[in-house]
Amino acid sequence: MAQSESSPTPGSTSGTATAADDREDELAEPGRLISSRWRPRSLRTTPSRQDRGLFDQPRGLPWMLNVEMWERFSYYGMRAILLYFITDTVAGGGLGLSETSGQVVIALYGMAVYFLAIPGGIFADRIIGPWLSTLYGGVVIMAGHICLTIPSTVTSWTGIVLVAVGTGFIKPNLTTIVGGLYDDDDIRRDAGFQLFYMSINVGAFASPLLTGWLREHYGYHAGFSSAAVGMAFALGAFVYGRHKLSAFAFTVPNPIRPEELRRLLLGTLGVLVAVGAVVAALQAVTGNLVTTVATAGLLVPVGAAVAYFVVMFRSPKVTTPERTHLRAYIPLWIGAVLFFMITEQAAGKMATFADSNTDL
């Protein structure tokens, strides 16, 4: 996945030209800027300590704070009313699923958001760079919110899927872009990320209040429309503020070679076939679609996590000191998994409890 902690050192690799070279540097060399109509003509390549703006931070940080605040506004605003929308009756403007089915959908949605950060990071790190990955993810999210504003079952489910996919692309890569604003020895990094996380909390605090009020007075689709507006603001800030970013945001740190791309596509196809086989086997055993989906939603990410750690430990690009650090990271990773398991209950079990046991 894309590395967020340092800016790359410009360099080049030698080799025989191939047909892939004609793709406007979409498969760029490490440290080379990709060719895109969105890339500014001038970008900072000097040490980050020379880039000073608001709060003595890099000039690109305030724009990324705006992006993150509005993106989290849209995400948490939608999530605040999503379970109620799924389980409410059709006459009440919902999708009419049972409470159990709704809980499973919410769990799968939360799993997908984090799980899809893996392909989102791969696209940024190996194919199109973090800025374009974030842009495409934001566009997909806004399209999903717009679909949710349309009172139709098909568009509603489409919107949920699009938001999950888009969030998987934008969430890891926006953090990467912020990390790329600082050099390794820049002491302002910690303060910058504190501001970044503060922007997350601001957006997450305000959005449920607004979407909940809109849902109460004008219906679910009005609540989802506020999420779409929030994402539009995020995209506007992201595009307008791109001139303030470092060159790192527009590079492909570890470009994929054609033969690696073929292996990646075949591997992805194999994973999809394996997941389909697991789901079919579970359905044959349980005979209950909800149980099957819930079980698959547990087994697939666990298997993916194990496989990901195996790949990182066995990769020739990982040095011995890095493997030592990776082993030390595993307990922290397990703790983070447990934390987010509890946190994600806010959109599921906690939402059901609040709906059934509180009277506001």
List each language-model region with its residue ranges:
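Intracellular loop-helix junctions on the cytosolic face of multi-pass helical membrane proteins
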Residues: A2-Q57, D184, G212-A351, D355-L360
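Short amphipathic helix-loop junctions that connect adjacent transmembrane helices
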Residues: A80-S101, A346-L360
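C-terminal ends and interior cores of transmembrane alpha-helices
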Residues: V139-W157
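Cytoplasmic loop-to-transmembrane helix junctions
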Residues: S101-G102, D185-L195, S199
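Intracellular juxtamembrane helix-capping segments at the cytosolic ends
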Residues: F169-D183
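Interfacial helix-cap and linker-helix signal at transmembrane-aqueous boundaries
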Residues: I86-T87, F123-D125, L210-Y218
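Central cavity-lining transmembrane alpha-helices of secondary-active solute carriers
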Residues: Q103-A124, K171
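Primarily marks hydrophobic transmembrane alpha-helices of the MFS/SLC 12-helix fold
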Residues: S133-T134
